[in-house]
């Protein structure tokens, strides 16, 4: 029998509302007909990203458009945006809220501190650094050839936004936080032997020209790098534009720039005046001579961190997390030339437990510890931690490094 009645719906359609936790929605309510779709413009708040943690109505997200399809009844829906993972650089600035003025560099700075960053300038850009006995500049990043986790201390940020790290071995309590011992150069009787790389001998001008020869210590560092960080595919996380300064400037062919700044004037700098002394892996910011983006800490960086020429200074670069020497009794090399005199080339070093954090110099043929320095790219993200020894910052591993 054919039905003799029909039902007519005079309603205005189905009401669909949407709320967003950690973001905004526009409009908040839409009315649609049977079987139609409702689309909303959604925007995450700062610190959150266009990915959903909760999605009560099963809608789809494409860019900033959230769509609920095939609507057959009224709905009240909600979504929650995921927290975005901050870069290590951004996390540092968020966590370290104290910005004291370092002031004079004429005395050591060894006091304990947390949540503290000091500011300076590199190439006209504000950079941030740790000083004194900072307790919260620990990073866990990478593994060595034996698959052991590697630990580092944050030295500072760089003008390219990368974060500079000092090697601390395979634990925060390490007393052997160096990759081995080495001479800086195997010969000492030429001014060129203060160079990390050089062309020929006889003068600094010669050393700076056609720099194809590696120092002894650079060979040690590069070999370690290829066997460990490169072999484990960590190169993609490292800045190629960060500058490692082997400052060979000299006005008298005796004392080099860092010696004058730190001994006479007490005025450290992060700037590197001469392009040939700016060791980089990318030629856009320096000499582009490094095959691998890794080198050493500078004497100026030690001064910023609390050190003082020819003084003990047990600061963060000296200590491990157990408040002992991170290198035991072993002194360790810096990248900065000190002086050339009496037929002997000298480079800066830092003292071990017998001379805690003592900033001094050594003949380049001396045997001292090698503590590599790397810089994590500005886009590298942290996956957790607060920088303490018990919860070091960890790095989010990705396909591209960012």
Q: Residues of each region from the PLM?
A:
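Small-residue (G/S/T/A) turn/hinge positions that recur once per unit in extracellular repeat modules
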Residues: 21-26, 30, 56-59
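Surface-exposed coil/turn segments at beta-strand junctions on protein surfaces, enriched
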Residues: 11, 33-35, 45, 61, ...
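Surface-exposed interfaces of beta-sheet-rich extracellular modules
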Residues: 1, 36-67
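Short proline/glycine-enriched turn/loop motifs at strand-loop junctions of beta-rich domains
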Residues: 13, 21-22, 45-50
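Well-ordered beta-strand positions in beta-sheet-rich domains
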Residues: 29, 65, 76-78, 151, ...
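Conserved "repeat-terminator" motif of extracellular CCP/Sushi domains
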Residues: 1-16, 64-84
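Long, domain-scale functional regions
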Residues: 2-11, 83-402
